[in-house]
């Protein structure tokens, strides 16, 4: 595919496990990618180079309005349009605390990125997408939010994370409703237990739970499992699908006796 035919995808949290794999998958399937993360550009130069010439890196914090604006401006300046937005960036509380000990500072930190930052970046991207021509399927762009099984599963040692992801599910529904007539499908993916840096600190706990049968498929999920799902929601494969939550968790959500 020539550069002039490539579609542009914006990916947040691009230097993390799911974000990086998502960028690789989109790049391998005809997209150019503009990605953002909090890592300084010189500190992730090797990883950025691994993604190739069709990748542009923007260092920034999703919680900051100016950084969100810079990300969108970079994508428009370099590619003239945004065909897909993949909201991957997310943080867990820096310290896991019982719900009765959770601090407002921790709550604000998690919500500021996971929910507020994603909501307002999506607003910026949607405003741009609305100005674009419809594709052969009648759509102007695609938006995918990476939520979590924690959106519907209680974990009282990280309540702020659960609330942030439950809120993100409503963000998905709101934008799906508002943008449907504009030809912009908005969906979310709810990963289960995925092998990333975020879960590495509790690997022993989840190894034990998986061995005991928590996940019917009997294994950890991988970032590639999520990236493939993202692609199907960005490339027109599911062009008539919006407001949906795609659960990718090896069956963990199934109620069993």
Indicate where each model-derived feature is located.
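Short C-terminal tail/terminal secondary-structure segment
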Residues: 96, 213, 231, 238, ...
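Residue(s) in the substrate-gating loop at a strand-loop-helix junction
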Residues: 148
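Conserved glycine-rich cofactor-binding loop
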Residues: 15-16
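Substrate-binding pocket helix/loop in short-chain dehydrogenase/reductase
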Residues: 96-99, 103-108, 211
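Short, small/polar-rich loop/turn modules that mediate ligand/substrate recognition or access, typified
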Residues: 180, 185, 241-243
